[in-house]
A protein has these predicted regions:
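Catalytic, metal-anchored helix/loop core of enzyme active sites in primary metabolism
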Residues: 1-381
């Protein structure tokens, strides 16, 4: 029996993770959970699964949940990291949203844990730091949960990076794939939240609409699989059945297909290299009709181009890009700026980002994150 710590238990990835654990309760125990502020949802999970440890990122929610459950509830970043380091924990599922997921990932690695990673911001902000931590803690390892990175992980199956010609990361294209760029000025929050394929949280749905999410995935792929940026491509695939592809140097092109159901990559991340039964929809190839693929429009989806640029510049630029984007998406969701302001202001922050030479440290990453948030907030006041 493996004890699972689920960070981000009430989001879309967290909910799917709970279902996978429920389907394999003979193998996994939901030992600890963390969430931001959803007291009722967490209380329900704790009671149903007899969860032993709990953390709420919001201190007020932690106090409320403590009264509700009559048990100690940890709070804040300190609480998240305490769960990530728990001696009884075997697997840490990091399904937290945004930069808040970075420190718990690093803590888990430092304590030799298996990290099932859905928090792409960890790798975007601190990829070189993660490389160092994994080298220092050989017992620890990461399995990716994002469907695209899970697909690449499965296609590679441990093959050395020298055999890879390029990675091809698929993108649905989001709700604005067929919109003319002239209409982008009028995009509303409701328009951007109307994703054609996936049901996700608001922040990642906006990132998908701007294709920043795909840009973050490019950086994550670079750091997860040690593949140079010039060997990573993005292809728009509206049906979202092919989750990503690997072109090998011998001419073989390997793809991973599956229904757009996050429970599949979650289970792969938890059980690899074993494949266990899972109650989910199967693809029926004759009914698929056709699968289509297009080049992305980097002019229309400027965020994707900016992410490639951030990756190539390296240093603290990816962390600053990510932080600026988080602030801007939040402002857009609150109706305080236009959709087209997101790439415009991200570019402004990136332009002013200093070049960092030498070894990137965690302190530099966290300082860059704070500075970019301060600058972006001032920019949109």
């Amino acid at each position: 029996m493996k004890n699972v710590v689920l960070l981000g238990a009430t989001g879309s990835i967290g909910t799917s993770s709970v279902d996978v654990i429920l389907q394999h309760s003979d193998i996994f125990k939901l030992y600890a959970v963390a969430a931001n502020s959803s007291v009722a949802k967490v209380a329900e999970i704790v009671r149903k699964f007899k969860v032993e440890r709990v953390c709420m990122f919001d201190p007020n929610a932690a106090k409320e949940l403590e009264k509700e459950l009559g048990m100690k509830v940890l709070a804040g970043m300190e609480g998240l990291c305490e769960l990530a380091a728990d001696p009884k924990a075997d697997i840490i599922i990091n399904a937290l949203m945004g930069a808040v997921g970075c420190l718990p990932t690093i803590t888990a690695i430092e304590h030799g844990k298996h990290v099932a990673l859905a928090n792409k911001e960890t790798m975007v902000m601190a990829g070189p730091v993660i490389w160092d931590k994994l080298a220092e803690n050989p017992k620890s390892f990461i399995t990716p949960i994002d469907s695209e990175h899970s697909a690449i992980f499965q296609c590679l199956s441990g093959r050395p990076e020298k055999e890879v010609e390029f990675l091809e990361i698929t993108a649905s294209g989001g709700p604005f794939r067929e919109w003319p760029i002239e209409k982008f000025e009028s995009i509303t929050v409701a328009d951007a939240l109307n994703h054609p394929v996936w049901s996700m949280g608001k922040k990642i749905t906006i990132d998908s609409a701007s294709m920043m999410n795909k840009g973050l995935e490019v950086l994550e792929a670079h750091f997860l699989f040690h593949i140079p940026y010039e060997q990573i491509k993005v292809v728009v695939h509206p049906q979202s059945m092919v989750h990503s592809l690997v072109q090998f140097r011998d001419g073989s092109l390997m793809a991973q297909l599956g229904a757009p159901d996050m429970r599949i990559p979650i289970q792969v991340a938890l059980t690899w290299p074993d494949r266990l039964p899972l109650e989910t929809k199967r693809l029926d190839l004759p009914t698929l009709a056709k699968l289509t693929f297009f080049e992305p429009d980097f002019n229309k989806f400027r965020c994707l181009a900016l992410a490639f640029e951030a990756g190539r510049r390296g240093g603290i630029v990816p962390a600053m890009m990510n932080a600026a984007n988080e602030v801007l998406v939040d402002a857009f969701l609150k109706g305080n700026l236009k959709f087209t302001d997101i790439p415009k202001h991200v570019e402004t922050i990136m332009t002013g980002a200093p070049t960092v030479t030498g070894h990137l440290t965690l302190d530099q990453v966290l300082e860059a994150d704070d500075e970019a948030r301060r600058l972006t907030s001032a920019l949109i006041k």
